[in-house]
A protein has these predicted regions:
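Eukaryotic low-complexity, mixed-charge intrinsically disordered interaction/regulatory segments enriched
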Residues: 2-11
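Tandem repeat scaffolds
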Residues: 10-13, 17, 21-135
């Protein structure tokens, strides 16, 4: 049996109803795989949204409010998160390779085990300071 996938169109309709409607649908459909690769979510208010394990490769989330969002293991490869509000977002295990986070606010965000290079966070507000080993 192959896992079900949600269509991009259905996902976007659900998101227009807000985070609560989206999260309720996710709770009712935990086995459905979600790929929102290349979608435009610019400026949307998605506070507290559950995007855990969602593929958002090359998506545009410019100035999107993702405060307190569950973004665990989400794939943001090549995504545009410029000026995104990621305050207190859970990005544990998220893939941020090649993502643009210029002026994104990461205050209190959990980046434990997130996959990124220093340049991916360049220009982000409240970005974690990379740890350097002493010589």
């Amino acid at each position: 049996m192959t896992p079900e996938h949600v269509t991009e169109r259905k996902a976007l309709v659900l998101l227009k109803f807000g985070s609560s409607a989206w999260n309720r649908w996710r709770d009712e459909n935990p086995d459905i795989m979600i790929a929102l690769d290349g979608v435009n979510l610019d400026g949307m208010i998605l506070t507290g949204v559950n995007f855990a394990h969602v593929s958002l490769r090359n998506a545009s989330l410019h100035a999107t409010n993702l405060m307190n969002a569950d973004l665990r293991s989400a794939d943001f490869t090549g995504a545009n998160l410029t000026e995104a509000d990621l305050i207190a977002a859970n990005l544990e295990g998220a893939i941020l390779r090649g993502a643009t986070l210029r002026e994104a606010d990461l205050l209190g965000a959990n980046l434990t085990s997130a996959q990124y290079a220093e340049e991916d966070l360049r220009g982000a507000l409240h970005a974690p300071v990379p740890r350097r080993t002493a010589l």
